[in-house]
Amino acid sequence: MLRVGGVLAAAALVLSACGSDSESSVAADCKPAHDVSTVKEGVLTVGLTNTPPYSFEQDREIAGIDSDILKALAEEECLEIEHAPYTYAAAIPAVNTGRVDVAVGGFYRTEARAKETTLSAPLYVDELTVMSEDGYSTVDDLLGKKIGTVEGYLWVDALKALPGTDLRVYADSGALANDLKAGRLDAALDGYGAATISAKGTDFELAVLEEDDRVPATNEPSQTSMLVHPKDEALAKALDELVGAMREDGRLVKILGEHGLPETAAEVGEARLVS
């Protein structure tokens, strides 16, 4: 469990690291599509997790699938973008206390998160994927092995319960991949998109973990969302409408393709929550 003191310390570091993604990107005659309020007037403040290809920092700006959607939102609502780095554990408190307007990083739509904060409409689907030298693809393959995953994923508790398995939980996908590459893990479990990025330039094999009731997350692809401040109803509505429009006109599929996800990832179906 993350200590409260750790969260507060992380928050202090985050606030000092917050930066602007643009000096003057909003035209003087820009007219917003919606009447939204933000933590800082005229600015969309983003909590950015380091989880490529969903969200990451590149050239001191937000990047990734979720970030590209937010750039479109900022343009539509005449907002500058400022961002700060957050871990998954610190992102929800940051949103709920109003330090940021929105947090991004392929957050799965879980019942627990829905009780804590506002989830955007589903963005895309993601699947639990295994990276390994030996092509592991089943839960049985993982038993007795040293495996790792990223904090905040809905399958963490299920993996902890696997008998004889040594599970290590990491703050982000980069740290997870580094330990796999260093030989400290037999397998790394991540979302499909993140695993694809991590495996580039390596000999690791990727496999979507086969359905198994011991890990319920394998039974249905998870929908992802952004986290929005619970009181920012207008902002949440504007984001949901934009996502719907981007899905209809093909912009969302284009963004997914640019970051290595298949077109089918945009086929989210009806909004749902997983436990």
Give a label for each model feature.
Residues 14-17:
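C-terminal motif of bacterial Sec signal peptides marking the signal peptidase cleavage site
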Residues 26-106:
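Extracytoplasmic small-molecule ligand-binding "clamshell" domains
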